């Protein structure tokens, strides 16, 4: 049957599909816009599966805090152009709202793919991503997310390229903000030496001892040299042992303790890492 140009235009606005695809879908659906949308969606999902293996090095980080809970999400895509797209940002924030409302404390970043079966307005997140891939034309993936419970603070830098979410105890919000900025700038990987996994410690020590051995250091000094380098590792990689960027005479632990603030945990996301 013949379809009107108005309906083709309307379907294009609703789905983001090409004019010819919209015309064919309407003809196949005998002019029924809802059926045509479903036809396009099915075809779009097939296209989306083909794009799913393409690299996603760009994206957007979004975060939201309430007094009792905070969440952060990284939605990945292929190009910076798409990362700035309004519908991409809208999708990121939809997923963020779902995570904030439905996911408990993740105890750090999570990449658990079971979240993709969660439903937003009756449609799974997996289906929403595939629809976005079909509409926008790039691979789009939910890369990771983080949830903290209790008092929290979130900070987004560089238009969504870096995100920080931390949980804390205390009343000095200025100190908490300073710590969030520290995390964004200095890239700590762990909260404290006590939270560094044992396998990471053993790996670092082995590297340091091997380096010292190759430099011709005495065998009986290797352990001591490795311990010294491990101390430097803690100063670089653990938040509480880092030097405070606003006053390098203090560590973050010194600064927070002096102001009755306790940092309980944090997540740091950066696009491309």
Swiss-Prot record:
Keyword Oxidoreductase recorded: no
UniProt keywords, alphabetically: Cytoplasm, Elongation factor, Protein biosynthesis
SUPFAM superfamilies (UniProt xref): Elongation factor Ts (EF-Ts), dimerisation domain (SSF54713), UBA-like (SSF46934)
InterPro entries, per database record: EF-Ts_dimer_sf, Transl_elong_EFTs/EF1B, Transl_elong_EFTs/EF1B_dimer, Transl_elong_Ts_CS, UBA-like_sf
Predominant location: cytoplasm
Location of region: Involved in Mg(2+) ion dislocation from EF-Tu: 79-82
Annotated GO CC locations: cytoplasm
Gene Ontology MF terms in the entry: translation elongation factor activity
One family name in Pfam for this protein: EF_TS
Subcellular location: Cytoplasm
Protein family membership: Belongs to the EF-Ts family.
Function: Associates with the EF-Tu.GDP complex and induces the exchange of GDP to GTP. It remains bound to the aminoacyl-tRNA.EF-Tu.GTP complex up to the GTP hydrolysis stage on the ribosome.
NCBIfam families referenced in this protein's UniProt entry, alphabetically: tsf
Protein name: Elongation factor Ts
Organism whose genome encodes this protein: Hydrogenobaculum sp. (strain Y04AAS1)
